[in-house]
Every structure is written in structure tokens, then in C-alpha cells.
Swiss-Prot record:
Signal sequence region: 1-24
Domain of life (superkingdom): Eukaryota
UniProt comment concerning the protein's domains: The presence of a 'disulfide through disulfide knot' structurally defines this protein as a knottin. The cysteine framework is VI/VII (C-C-CC-C-C).
Protein name: Conotoxin Lt6.2
Source lineage: Eukaryota, Metazoa, Spiralia, Lophotrochozoa, Mollusca
Annotated localization: Secreted
Any single GO CC term annotated in Swiss-Prot or TrEMBL for this entry: extracellular region
Matching Pfam families: Conotoxin
Length: 80
């Protein structure tokens, strides 16, 4: 019975230690588990191009419309 209690307490301490080290090192070399797969920092804001500035993809533009033929951001969606 004592051995069971000791094992349960040891597992609880090891689990708590693992969770705190993941959180502690999330700002350094290690990242939080949710961010490990993407490798991105969600707090970083991305810059976008204003209308009439150059673009390569739609997500480069603030309005999310890129004329790929001319590589220019558009103010409104293109007419189809």
C-alpha cells in the first residue's frame, strides 16, 4: 500500500514538473506544445501591402485581393 502511494505521488510530481518546464522554456529554445508544429508566434502581427503596392499572393495584401497578372494589390475584389 505504501509503495502504491509513493508511485502515485511520484507520477504526480513528474507530470507537474513536465508541464512547468514546457511552459518555462516556451520563450527560449523550447516552444509550447501547440506552437511546436507550426513554429510560428501567434502574437507577431504580419505586415500587409496597401492597394497599388506589389504583391505575390492574396494574403500579402491588406484587402486580400492581388492582381496576379500585374502583381499589384487591389482595393476591392476583381470583377469576374
Amino acid at each position: 500500500m505504501k509503495l502504491t502511494r509513493v508511485l502515485i505521488i511520484a507520477v504526480l510530481f513528474l507530470t507537474a514538473y513536465q508541464l512547468t518546464t514546457v511552459e518555462t522554456y516556451s520563450r527560449g529554445k523550447w516552444m509550447h506544445r501547440a506552437l511546436r508544429s507550426t513554429g510560428k508566434n501567434p502574437k507577431v502581427t504580419r505586415e500587409c501591402s496597401s492597394p497599388d503596392e506589389s504583391c505575390t499572393y492574396h494574403y500579402n495584401c491588406c484587402q486580400l485581393y492581388c492582381n496576379k497578372e500585374e502583381n499589384v494589390c487591389l482595393e476591392n475584389s476583381p470583377e469576374v
